[in-house]
């Protein structure tokens, strides 16, 4: 059985296939982007919505960027920060020496009955 990964990003699908060691079918469908500070809530909403449209088990993902100096912002709203002020704008907001950041990826799997969620965190610094 091929894993259906709902994403518009070919690179994410290739990377997931490589990491999981299985064949991935990338499917791009329109999904509502809910507003929440809880990445798990966002991912679960996307997974259930994707399953409702496709009627097959699905995997989805979303990301969060937690900048320590900004109290965890922009969090799951990173896409809107990026579109609004860009990478340089985010970097310009940081004045203190601590420019540490957590890049969090949340993955969700939903088969119509069971939702599973996992997060991966990469620690880094804003240049």
Per-region residue spans from a language model:
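Anionic-ligand binding patches
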Residues: 2-4, 11-127
């Amino acid at each position: 059985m091929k894993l259906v990964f709902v994403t518009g990003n070919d690179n994410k699908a290739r990377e997931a296939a490589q990491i999981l060691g299985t064949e991935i079918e990338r499917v791009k469908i329109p999904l509502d982007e809910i507003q929440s500070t809880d990445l798990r809530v966002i991912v679960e909403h996307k997974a259930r919505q994707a399953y409702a449209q496709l009627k097959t088990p699905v995997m989805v993902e979303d990301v969060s960027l937690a900048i320590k100096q900004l109290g965890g912002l922009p969090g799951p709203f990173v896409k809107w920060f990026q579109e609004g002020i860009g990478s340089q704008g985010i970097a310009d907001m940081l004045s203190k020496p601590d420019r540490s950041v957590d890049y969090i990826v949340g993955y969700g799997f939903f088969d119509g009955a069971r939702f599973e969620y996992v997060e991966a965190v990469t620690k880094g610094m804003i240049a």
